[in-house]
Amino acid sequence: VEPQSNSPKKILFIDEQPICRLGMESLIERYPQFNLLGFATKLDDVEPSSISPDIIAIDIVVAKTNGIRALKDLKRKFSHASILVVTSHDETLFAERCLRAGAKGFSMKTAPIEELIQALGDVSRGRLYLSSKMRALILNRISEHEAERSRSRFERLSDRELLVIQHISQSMDNREIAKQMKISIKTIESHRSRIKSKLQLSSPSELVRFAMRLQNKAF
């Protein structure tokens, strides 16, 4: 187990609004686990040679042209710092993009103080931070995407191929399926091959698992 440092995590706050900078200063003073190194209003004001933060809290509004690209540039300049976006931008529109650009977390300025402190703590330990609302939204998107992908693949099957899958889900082998459907074993093998291709399944075992999930309405 690696020893954990008790030194306060150093924070650099980049925001063009004075009221936000004052609010952050007042907040951080109440939490000894953090140390506010300073403020900047523009990305050009920040250079690695002059400051070495553990956390960079930034409002992407400071980058007038492309805030997402600014995050990538910031990550290149401060490769050892964790970036937390603290902004009024809608998290449902910008959070995922910010994470892909290199941010470790995303917090709305309207979030409760406790959430911001949790966000700072999480990113300082190398963890990703998103609000509970945003985490649920992303999980729903993933679930809906997978369900839609399964449905679209499933609709490519012919009626006879669907019947073959039904028999596979009942643990029937090719000989039994051929007898049940009154067709040759070679035809069943051809059906199975086409089913795997249409469903993008790489092996017979994957086909069996898909058939079982379908039988249980869990695909």
What is the role of each PLM region?
Residues 39-55:
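Acidic, metal-coordinating helix/loop segments flanking the phosphotransfer/catalytic sites
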Residues 59-60, 87:
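Active-site residues of response regulator receiver
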Residues 94-100, 104-159, 163, 213-218:
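Short, flexible helix-to-coil linker/hinge segments that flank and couple to helix-turn-helix
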Residues 193-219:
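Basic, Lys/Arg-enriched C-terminal extension of HTH/homeodomain DNA-binding domains
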